Amino acid sequence: MLSNYVVKEILNDNKLKREYEFTIDNKYFFSQLDAKLLEIAKNVKIPGFRAGKASIDLIKKEYLNNAVNTLIRKIVEDTSSEFIKNGKFGEIISSNVSVISCPDYGMGVSSTSGDPAGDNLVYKLSFEVMPEAPLIALDDIVLSDIEADIQDSDISEFIENLKKQCSEFVEVSDSEYRVKMGDKVVVDYQNRIKGKMLKGGDTKDLAVIVGRGLVLKDFEDQLIGMKIGESKSFPIQFPDNYGVAYLVGKSADVSVTVKNIFMMKAIEENENVIKYYQFKDEQALKDFARNKIKQQFDKISFAIVKKELFDYLDKTYSIDVPECVVTKEIDKINQEIQDSAGTVQVDVKAEAMKRVKLGILLVKMSRHHNISINKDDVFSFINTYYSDYGISLNDVLRMLQSNKDFANYISGKVLEDKVINYIIRLVKKDKKVMTTQELNLMLENM
């Protein structure tokens, strides 16, 4: 096909951007158009004509525009693919095609007539290429090797937090005690609209944990301040998003009587925590606490060492970065800033360029050292970090199956961490022993 088109270089900034103008030979274009129309004529069924017997003029009238559009797409795809393949440009990140002009196909000729008239098919191909990245020199890197100094106070604090998590409701015996937020209240209540009892509106021994949002907020709010044995009546409004359609937007009169109140009480003794979580003994509880603290310590220390490495790579290596990838990264960062309610302060473009550069360096590292990921790597990553996404492990796994963009994002993060761990394993270390307080302070100052 090379003889059927001419290519003119429009832009080559000696970096990553390329632009070329393609001019397609008119005789070639019209010969292909005639062939396309003849193909249509042989196969199309037109009322009143046997297959293949409709005149070419009728075929042109009905199918010329579609035939031209299909032909232009095919010629652009074939010529640009051939040019890129023969040009040995390396990895192309993004490409864009814009048609500048096309022949006046209304004046086109058949293969038996004279020269075609009008403009040539001319289009512009723009693309960016992946830069040549240097291989990271591992012998030049020194990173911190942070060892945890877990103290008895850390273990005690962890166990105290466990006690709060396994709090239990204790029945209130004080007749003057008034319901507070977080209390569990057992009530009898009746619901009426215009004096008529609602279906299921006469309920006994309903347990409500005030503030959980499992009943209407107006109902919860009215319970606050009530005592055991107290009764009261009040109106409520069913909201527009209420689950029972015929009650949406309606008002009801509620009568409620508090029968019992339970207040939340934290477990105070270690032996109760041991019993609640079914530990063998107190030493097993402390070992569990130490292990969990160590896991969190390792997670934070990895984040700190990762930043050390990224800062070093950003300072040491300078490469051109593709503008199209930087633009996408800018959009991601702006979304992150929006999600954080503006609490993140950052030079968006500089941060985007840094992220793209680091990504290119790490990809080069992964390819050179044949580093790849598998399902176990992905699950291990999710199991470690799923709480960072604010949803359950099962929800993350479901998103991984159903959301391609999320799956690609996770795969990218897993590969990034695997390459970083590979680098950390091989570079020189500066050993440091730190307490959890020192480590958290360092994290805050990152």
UniProtKB/Swiss-Prot annotation:
Record remark: domains: Consists of 3 domains; the N-terminus binds the ribosome, the middle domain has PPIase activity, while the C-terminus has intrinsic chaperone activity on its own.
Q: GO molecular function terms here?
A: peptidyl-prolyl cis-trans isomerase activity
Alphabetic keyword roster: Cell cycle, Cell division, Chaperone, Cytoplasm, Isomerase, Rotamase
Catalytic activity, EC: 5.2.1.8
Q: Which reaction does it catalyse?
A: [protein]-peptidylproline (omega=180) = [protein]-peptidylproline (omega=0)
Tell me the compartments it is located in: Cytoplasm
Cross-referenced Pfam families:
FKBP_C (PF00254), Trigger_C (PF05698), Trigger_N (PF05697)
What does this chain do? Answer: Involved in protein export. Acts as a chaperone by maintaining the newly synthesized protein in an open conformation. Functions as a peptidyl-prolyl cis-trans isomerase.
Give the highest taxon in the source lineage.
Answer: Bacteria
- Gene this chain is encoded by: tig
GO CC, alphabetical: cytoplasm
Where does it mainly reside? cytoplasm
Q: Which GO terms describe its biological process?
A: cell division; protein folding; protein transport
Which lineage do the record's taxonomy fields give for this organism? Bacteria, Pseudomonadati, Pseudomonadota, Alphaproteobacteria, Rickettsiales
Family per UniProt?
Belongs to the FKBP-type PPIase family. Tig subfamily.
In Swiss-Prot or TrEMBL terms, this protein is called Trigger factor
Question: Does Cell cycle show up as a keyword for this record?
Answer: yes
Please list the residue ranges annotated as the PPIase FKBP-type domain. 182-267
